[in-house]
């Protein structure tokens, strides 16, 4: 009788403990999926309103037209609530929706094809059970003919989509392979930092047999810099890479443009191990060819620092710098640690492609708000009141002072970038500063 009682007790405990263990396992998988969604920065493209995360509707301008991100909440009508795991995996890694239509590669499924089954299952668990369903319809993507014909994507996938999951390099350690897996896969760094072809395809998805992977790319007036060691931002130390990805700030530099959003939404949440793994991988990438010899910069005499401090401004660019930039970036171009990035010796400033420095002058910039540095310090925009020749003079001065050897910028370079800036954005900035009323009736902060 006693034995039967003990058996019954153990059976009852087992019945109670099994669901508890399963629930704990499910919770752990959902939490891992949430982390992986951070790594993939899914929220950046699939959110158009902060109060509706992952509900889609964000317009993305491409050379082929406007693509709208889709609702990836577990909503049954407009989201992915009816997706099985296999449906989800096919969309994530092959670019095929549940109903069979092909997704446009603005969704970086070529990179996501490298994501493991284990991580894909964790992502599925998160999006099905950790995300709030939102009943928001998907806007219609509008691409120019013939790119609006999705059947063309069949050929695109045959030509450009990489095959299979990430292949570990046995010659490298675990940390290096982890970094490569993240950079090439979920983090999809190549989507911005690798050159694209005429069909919008990335020219490489890893560094095997090519010198193009992560070598820099310009799109929509922004230049995503070369990430390889010895080139551009690749010149920084591994610790500096970790700090930049965690805080958006490192010694003498800061993120800008879309990268600030990446830090704010994604990389600041990476584990320490993953941050160091990414830094190890990026630090190992060495291009086969030597860096190009910098173009000879026009001399600025007397020395820029001396001239600015003495009030002697022999060029229009120097005067523009003194009027607009000197207070924050200082007369020696050194900036202020963690507040205003240095311009002297800044690889982004002296990049062969000046698009980003022009864009920042035109539209301003904002540092990310992170857990370690919550203040989103911002640089004001000057495009609303500086002409193209003035912006060119200012950019040339910055790119050729304090030992910088960037090539000159001309007004045509500025005009090209300005054409890619939404005119309404500059009008809103002007209204905010001058209290004018914009064409759409929006006043400045104290406008009537």
Label for each model-derived stretch:
Residues 42-45, 189-192, 325-328:
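Short cysteine clusters
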Residues 18-24:
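Sec/Tat signal peptide C-region and signal peptidase I cleavage site
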Residues 75-95, 112, 180, 195-196, ...:
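A structural feature that tracks compact, well-ordered secondary-structure segments
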Residues 316-359, 375:
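C-terminal structural cap/anchor segments
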